[in-house]
From Swiss-Prot:
<comment type="similarity">
    <text>Belongs to the RecX family.</text>
</comment>
<dbReference type="InterPro" id="IPR003783">
    <property type="entry name" value="Regulatory_RecX"/>
</dbReference>
<protein>
    <recommendedName>
        <fullName>Regulatory protein RecX</fullName>
    </recommendedName>
</protein>
<dbReference type="GO" id="GO:0005737">
    <property type="term" value="C:cytoplasm"/>
</dbReference>
<dbReference type="InterPro" id="IPR053926">
    <property type="entry name" value="RecX_HTH_1st"/>
</dbReference>
<dbReference type="Pfam" id="PF21982">
    <property type="entry name" value="RecX_HTH1"/>
</dbReference>
<dbReference type="GO" id="GO:0006282">
    <property type="term" value="P:regulation of DNA repair"/>
</dbReference>
<keyword id="KW-0963">Cytoplasm</keyword>
<comment type="function">
    <text>Modulates RecA activity.</text>
</comment>
<dbReference type="InterPro" id="IPR036388">
    <property type="entry name" value="WH-like_DNA-bd_sf"/>
</dbReference>
<dbReference type="Pfam" id="PF02631">
    <property type="entry name" value="RecX_HTH2"/>
</dbReference>
<feature type="region of interest" description="Disordered">
    <location>
        <begin position="1"/>
        <end position="26"/>
    </location>
</feature>
<dbReference type="InterPro" id="IPR053924">
    <property type="entry name" value="RecX_HTH_2nd"/>
</dbReference>
<feature type="compositionally biased region" description="Polar residues">
    <location>
        <begin position="1"/>
        <end position="12"/>
    </location>
</feature>
Length: 183
């Protein structure tokens, strides 16, 4: 039976705080974050800085991730807009605000929002109002329409639709729903 000597404490491995090792740790951390969902360069930079990584290490790691295509703010913005507009019913203003919070450049934001035309935005607003109106109790009391209009216009405003579009859509859809219920 052969025995191996115990590793010497004086011959320790690489210093865990050395620059190359810190860079690899930061890279591994970014990869773990990216497995959950796509992230912007600014989001990853914020997470790394929060963890205490130095600016040069952060820049090198993010440059590596951009070079291999794992971080792409333009692609992120396009996917975000498509997903949040379709599934969450967000309007252009709300989407732009969300992307700004995630650190996406204004130029990239405007190009990704260009895919949503006014007709598609209005169609989505109409569907949202129609769905909500089906569950809404509509009274014949005076002033009840005003309450419903305010509630629905507020819902659309919180989702980032313009006030003029919200009021127009709510007025048209409310009239249509009243007509549908009369028949």
């Amino acid at each position: 039976m052969t025995s191996f000597p115990h590793p010497s404490t004086s011959e320790s491995g690489p210093d865990p705080d050395s620059e190359p090792n810190r860079e690899e740790q930061a890279h591994a951390y970014c990869l773990r974050l990216l497995t959950a969902r796509a992230r912007t360069r600014a989001e990853l930079a914020g997470k790394l800085t929060q963890r205490g990584y130095d600016e040069p290490v952060v820049a090198r790691v993010l440059d590596r991730l951009v070079d291999v295509g794992l971080v792409d703010d333009e692609d992120f913005a396009e996917q975000w807009v498509r997903s949040r507009h379709l599934y969450a019913g967000k309007g252009k203003r709300a989407l732009a605000a969300e992307l700004r919070r995630k650190g996406v450049d204004d130029e990239v934001i405007s190009s990704s929002l260009a895919d949503i035309d006014a007709g598609a935005e209005r169609d989505r607003a109409e569907r949202l109002v129609r769905d909500r109106l089906r569950r809404e109790k509509l009274d014949d009391e005076p002033g009840s329409d005003l309450k419903v209009k305010r509630r629905l216009a507020g819902m659309l405003a919180r989702r980032g639709y313009s006030q003029s579009m919200a009021l127009d859509v709510v007025t048209v859809e409310l009239a249509g729903e009243r007509e549908r219920r009369r028949v």
